[in-house]
């Protein structure tokens, strides 16, 4: 069903001219599990990342509200997403992605929410999972169409992958150090991507 969902999304985004132009694909690890931590502005970035990585499947951490939206809920569920309750995160927030990584799967985390505090928590979550699972993190940035309205206006999307890294720091101190590193990478990639977007 992932294949069907990915192809449905691909056709829609392509027809509307919103399928992302991708940079830095050489930075993606060729095999094994890893985390892809991508900037987040709306739900179109989730769809574009899934399409860009296809046929490799990503298991997305997605806020549970997305699963409750008509149509989009079906797509998100069948793009291997698993729900996360940001208000009451339980141990499964760490356990599920850690297990997927150990199985060699790719986990997608969108660590910049609408509020900066929310973004920091999710960045630290990505770093914690990478630290415990001893998995690589690939930072990524998305700029462009954010929602159905943008897609209907034929808004374009742009995606860039940065260089992967391991969380080599230990304990809380290591997590804080690498959370800052991830924040820096995401800002730098967003700036780099904005330079590459053709001026209208």
PLM regions: where:
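Membrane-anchoring hydrophobic helices of lipid-metabolizing enzymes
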Residues: 1-35, 44-45, 73, 78-80, ...
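A generic structural signal for well-ordered alpha-helical segments
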Residues: 13, 53, 76, 100, ...
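Catalytic core of membrane glycerolipid acyltransferases/transacylases, capturing the structured
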Residues: 16, 30-88
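Residue-level recognition of alpha-helix initiation/capping sites
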Residues: 3-4, 44, 67, 91-92, ...
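Non-catalytic C-terminal accessory region of glycerolipid acyltransferases
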Residues: 92-200
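Residue-level "edge-of-site" marker
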Residues: 26, 89, 143
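Generic preference for hydrophobic
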Residues: 22, 36, 60-61, 81, ...
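Short, charge-rich binding segments
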Residues: 27, 51, 86, 98-103
């Amino acid at each position: 069903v992932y294949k069907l969902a990915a192809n449905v999304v691909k056709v829609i985004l392509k027809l509307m001219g919103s399928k992302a132009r991708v940079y830095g694909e050489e930075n993606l690890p060729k095999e094994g599990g890893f985390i892809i931590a991508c900037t987040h502005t709306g739900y179109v970035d989730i769809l574009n990342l899934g399409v860009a990585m296809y046929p490799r499947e990503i298991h997305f951490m997605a806020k549970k509200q997305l699963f409750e939206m008509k149509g989009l809920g079906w797509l998100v569920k069948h793009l291997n997403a698993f729900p996360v309750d940001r208000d009451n995160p339980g141990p499964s927030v760490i356990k599920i992605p850690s297990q997927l990584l150990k199985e060699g799967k790719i986990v997608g985390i969108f660590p910049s929410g609408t509020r900066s505090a929310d973004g920091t928590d999710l960045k630290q979550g990505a770093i914690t999972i990478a630290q415990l699972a001893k998995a690589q993190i690939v930072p990524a940035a998305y700029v462009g169409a954010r929602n159905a309205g943008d897609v209907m206006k034929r808004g374009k999307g742009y995606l860039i992958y940065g260089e992967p890294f391991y969380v080599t720091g230990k304990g809380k101190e290591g997590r804080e150090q690498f959370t800052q590193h991830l924040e820096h990478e995401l800002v730098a990639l967003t700036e780099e991507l904005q330079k590459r977007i053709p001026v209208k």
